[in-house]
Amino acid sequence: MVSSAAGGSAKDGSVAGEKTAPIGVFDSGVGGLTVARAIIDQLPHEALLFVGDGAHGPYGNQSMEAVQGYAVAIGDYLVDQGCKAIVMACNTATAAAYETFQKRYSIPIVQVITPAVRRAVATTRSGKVGVIATQATVDSGAYAREFERLCQRQPECGDVTVLSVACPRFVDFIERGVTTGRQVLG
């Protein structure tokens, strides 16, 4: 766990001194540190509390029920630490627990699937989008549902064809910080 935060605590997420309350960020491992880095770059005066679930991760080959349980335990911890918002920096945790988080916590919940889908829709030239993810994320259909939801609300996105492929070995590369080179290409 990486922490640079201070602040009070309440189960509903309300905190005395909101400016010092941290933003909680979590992932099933250390891959979410890239999300934490982006938050620091965009919001340099905000405190962050990062949780990487090395005890249970990676989540990709586990049941959605198990992942939801791990995610809720982390969410409860972050709220107990006084976080004013939670960033779910894990696709699989988002697929398993985002709706639960929205109902359970009275603080803002940010996840990574919607922004990725928006970017893909905005940048595709062919109308075809490839999604590589864990087996659990692909099986959940979370990306396909989000593409469908977005394209229903924004007809200008046209017909987008989504091809989702599980890449279980990719998680190991991300956790080791390997994002380029021959190792990734196999």
Residue ranges and their predicted role:
Residues V2-G186:
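Non-catalytic structural scaffold of enzyme domains
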